[in-house]
Amino acid sequence: MITFQDTYDSRKKEIENFLELMKFLEKKENEREDGKSKFSEFFYPETGGIHLTYQSLINILKSNVSLMIYNIIEYTVTNLIDSIYDEIRVNHLSYIDVNDSIRNLWRKTILRSVNEPNANFSTFLRKNEEIISAILSNNELNMYAKNTLPGGNLDGTSIKETFESHGIQVRTSSRNYRPDILIGIKENRNNLAHGSVSFVEAMREDSIDDIRANESLVVGFLEELIETVSTYIEDQKYKKV
C-alpha cells in the first residue's frame, strides 16, 4: 500500500528533478561555440526540427514547476486534514468526543449550504435539525477535507486558518512560513487554471534560482506541518480534554 509519505516524497523528487532539468538547459544555453549555444543545437537546428527558443521553453517549464509546487501543497494539506478525520472515524468519535475547534468546524460545514443562492429559512431550520439530531443521537462524525478546505485557494493565510480550525497552531515564526511566496504560488496556479495568463508569460520574471529557493522554503514549511500534525494525532489532540 502506497502511503501518504511515499507519495509526498515522490512528488517532491519530481519537482527537484524538474528543477535539475531547467538548470541543465540553462547550462547548455550558456555554453557557446562559435557564438552559438549548445541549446540551439537541440531545439533550434538550422536543418529543421523543433523551432523553440530557450526562453520560451524555460518560461513554460517554470510555469509547470510552479503548478507542481502548488499541487504538492494541496496534496499535503488535504491528506494531513483527512488523516485527522480518519482518526475520528477509526475511534468512532461523536460530537461530544472531539475538541471545541472541530465541533465548531463541523457545525459550520453543515450550515454552509445556508449561504447558497437558493437557500431559505427552511434550509436553515433543516440544517439546524440535522445538527441537533446528530448531537443527541451521539452519531459518529464523518468529515472530509474536500468539504472543509477552500478548494484551489490554499495560501499561507488559508492554510494557517485551516489548521487553527482544528486546534493546531502553525509555526508562523518559522523562516519557512512565507505567506508572500505561498500567495504568489496560489495566484499563479489560479491564473494558469483560468487561462488569464499563458504558460510563457506566467513566470517570466522569476529566475530558476528564485523558483528553487521558493521550493526549498515551501518544502520546509510542509515538512514542519507534517511533523506538527503527526504530534497532534499521536497526542490525540483532536479529542475533547
Question: What does each of the following model-derived ranges do?
Answer:
Residues 22, 26, 76-80, 84, ...:
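A generic secondary-structure signal for well-formed alpha-helical elements
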Residues 68-69, 75-173:
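Helix-loop junctions and short alpha-helical segments
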Residues 73-77, 190-193:
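Short alpha-helix boundary/capping elements
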Residues 1-67, 81, 91-101:
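Charged alpha-helical initiation segments
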Residues 2-13, 17-20, 27-38, 160-241:
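Polyanionic, low-complexity intrinsically disordered segments
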Residues 55-74, 175, 182, 204, ...:
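Short, charged/polar micro-motifs that form catalytic or ligand-binding hotspots
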Residues 1-4, 8-11, 50, 95, ...:
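Intrinsic-disorder-associated interaction segments
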